[in-house]
């Protein structure tokens, strides 16, 4: 597949963020770049119903266009770090990484599990959910404010609209929070991933570039996982 098509797929991912992030963006923010749309949550978290937790340090918000059954964003409110690239955060600001991990695994774990049950099934145990949630950054984020993705593995969602969406969360483009610094990718080197064949994250079956077939399969995989998990 040509490099031109690769670039087109990457542009699809980056341009998809132009969808509005909030339902009612205040007038003072409406003319700013779409890449700054997460800023409203950091500055005025109390104003938005999709914010489920905030304190002086972080904000936890439901992604308005989730790419899985459950898809949350955890954002630092530190003005000195919110615009730092996630790969630089992973490499040079380990204290922030550790703080975010401590929120996910500690103070916010109950909220995250409850949110997952609300989105998937109330019958799921914390143990089942713990193995079905991934946490990480995009190597090439489409939004300016640093945001950590906390999401279930299913990738079953109407907002998962194209191959680029799926690949961005199921390839090395999605950098898991526990990735060693020695294994971090170099910025700007992963765009070739967007030309690869689509592959089920769970069973490994490949679908070429047939996104519609993949989406149907992902629903089947989710249904199978859920049936087995609630029967345990």
UniProtKB/Swiss-Prot annotation:
Query: Catalysed reaction(s)?
Result: a 5'-end adenosine-5'-diphospho-5'-2'-deoxyribonucleoside-DNA + H2O = a 5'-end 5'-phospho-2'-deoxyribonucleoside-DNA + AMP + 2 H(+); a 5'-end adenosine-5'-diphospho-5'-ribonucleoside-2'-deoxyribonucleotide-DNA + H2O = a 5'-end 5'-phospho-ribonucleoside-2'-deoxyribonucleotide-DNA + AMP + 2 H(+); a 3'-end 2'-deoxyribonucleotide-3'-diphospho-5'-guanosine-DNA + H2O = a 3'-end 2'-deoxyribonucleotide 3'-phosphate-DNA + GMP + 2 H(+)
| Residue ranges of every copy of the HIT domain listed in the record | 38-160
How the protein is affected by changing residue 161 to A? Strongly decreases abolishes enzyme activity. Decreased affinity for DNA
The effect of residue 161 to E is: Nearly abolishes enzyme activity. Strongly reduced affinity for DNA
- Tell me the outcome of changing residue 138 to A: Decreased enzyme activity. Mildly decreases affinity for DNA
Q: Which domain of life is it from?
A: Eukaryota
Q: Where is this site: Interaction with DNA?
A: 41
- GO biological process terms on file: mismatch repair; single strand break repair
Query: From which source organism is this entry?
Result: Schizosaccharomyces pombe (strain 972 / ATCC 24843)
What are the UniProt keywords, alphabetically?
Cytoplasm, DNA damage, DNA repair, DNA-binding, Hydrolase, Metal-binding, Nucleus, Zinc
Record's protein name: Aprataxin-like protein
A GO CC term? nucleus
């Amino acid at each position: 597949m040509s490099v031109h098509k690769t670039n087109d797929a990457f542009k699809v991912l980056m341009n998809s963020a132009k969808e509005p992030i909030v339902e009612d963006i205040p007038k003072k923010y409406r003319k700013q770049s779409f890449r700054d749309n997460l800023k409203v949550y950091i500055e005025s978290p109390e104003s938005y119903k999709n914010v489920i937790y905030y304190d002086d340090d972080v904000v936890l918000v439901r992604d308005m266009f989730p790419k899985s059954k459950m898809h949350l964003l955890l954002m630092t409110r530190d003005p000195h770090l919110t615009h730092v690239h996630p790969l630089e955060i992973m490499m040079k600001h380990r204290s922030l990484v550790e703080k975010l991990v401590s929120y996910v695994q500690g103070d916010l774990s109950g909220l995250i599990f409850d949110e997952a049950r609300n989105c998937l099934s109330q019958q799921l145990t914390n143990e089942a959910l713990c193995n079905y949630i991934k946490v990480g950054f995009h190597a090439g984020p489409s939004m300016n404010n640093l945001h950590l993705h906390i999401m279930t593995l299913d990738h079953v969602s109407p907002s998962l609209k194209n191959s680029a969406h799926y690949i961005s969360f199921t390839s090395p483009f999605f950098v898991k929070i526990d990735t060693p610094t020695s294994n971090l990718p170099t910025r700007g080197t992963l765009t070739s991933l967007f030309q690869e064949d689509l592959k089920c994250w769970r069973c490994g079956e490949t679908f070429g570039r047939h996104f519609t077939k993949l989406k149907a399969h992902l629903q089947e995989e989710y249904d199978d996982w859920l049936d087995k998990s609630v029967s345990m």
